[in-house]
């Protein structure tokens, strides 16, 4: 594996003249939830699972309609779990991972029914996932195949929706809990945790199936969420720096930090729709009662 090691220099605007995003509050979820996962379909955001402010893990999907600014419970028959993943394809939501969960649940949004997909032998919690050309790419995490959550994974695989099969890929350069997004045929795996917050951004070329680049951020970030707008990957919240907000420009490979009035949070969800960044749920401590109901939105133009 040939990997270029590059350090991300800070732009002048990073320190002195950082762009400011102004968030406004929207209708709250029915309950505070952390360690959630989300997808966006048309003008609806679907938030799955996570731990509840009153204790225990959620077994339902809550739908937020952006146009109406209203929440509704979509389905209450999911397996309970936290730190899971979800992706959407062809009006279905694919929900998988989460500590101790080897199942793949497929929610048909047209019928509100759930079917099971192929068993995921290499399940983890707090992993990253992204979808590309009918394949769901899954990487990193902890608690591989039922191991302790302090055991970090470098496993990389994809689920082929058409064939309902899980398939191996070259291991990640560094084992860690992490998040990632796909832009222009490349997977960007950003930050994470493997005992300390990670400063790494690893890049995987989906055309050549090779890990091609590695960048180093000025500081580590974990417990964050990601959302994509064009060539930019927005990085939201963090375990330690809970008001962290930045974007990584994949055309210049530079990181730009933003200032904002965002509510502090970690292990939240983030989505982008019509040039607006939505931040949902999360928590502020390891105590479940700190889980957040709030959804906020800011214009990113």
Predicted regions mapped to residue ranges:
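Kelch-like beta-propeller repeat domains
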Residues: 19-301
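Bacterial Sec-dependent N-terminal signal peptides
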Residues: 1-22
């Amino acid at each position: 594996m040939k990997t270029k090691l590059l350090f991300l220099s800070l732009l002048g605007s990073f320190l002195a003249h950082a762009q400011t995003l102004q968030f406004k509050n929207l209708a709250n979820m029915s309950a505070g939830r952390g360690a959630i996962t989300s997808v966006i379909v048309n003008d609806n955001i679907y938030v799955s699972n996570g731990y509840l402010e009153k204790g225990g893990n959620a077994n339902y999907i809550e739908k937020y309609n952006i146009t109406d600014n209203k929440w509704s419970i979509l389905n209450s028959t999911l397996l309970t779990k936290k730190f899971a993943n979800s992706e959407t394809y062809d009006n279905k939501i694919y929900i998988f991972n989460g500590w101790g969960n080897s199942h793949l649940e497929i929610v048909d949004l047209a019928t509100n029914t759930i079917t099971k997909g192929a068993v995921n032998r290499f399940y983890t919690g707090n992993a990253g996932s992204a979808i590309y050309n009918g394949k769901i790419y899954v990487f990193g995490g902890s608690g591989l195949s039922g191991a302790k959550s302090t055991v970090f994974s470098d496993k990389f695989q994809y689920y082929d929706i058409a064939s309902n099969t899980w398939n191996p890929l070259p291991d990640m350069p560094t084992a860690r809990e992490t998040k990632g997004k796909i832009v222009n045929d490349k997977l960007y795996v950003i930050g994470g945790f493997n005992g300390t917050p990670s400063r790494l951004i690893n890049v995987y070329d989906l055309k050549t199936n090779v890990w091609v680049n590695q960048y180093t951020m000025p500081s580590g970030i974990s417990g964050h969420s990601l959302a994509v707008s064009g060539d930019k990957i927005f990085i939201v919240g963090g375990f330690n720096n809970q008001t962290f907000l930045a974007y990584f420009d994949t055309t210049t490979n530079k990181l730009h930090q933003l200032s904002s009035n965002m509510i502090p949070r970690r292990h939240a969800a983030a989505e982008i729709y019509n040039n607006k960044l939505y931040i949902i749920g999360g928590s502020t401590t390891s105590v479940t009662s700190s889980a957040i109901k709030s959804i906020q939105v800011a214009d990113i133009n």
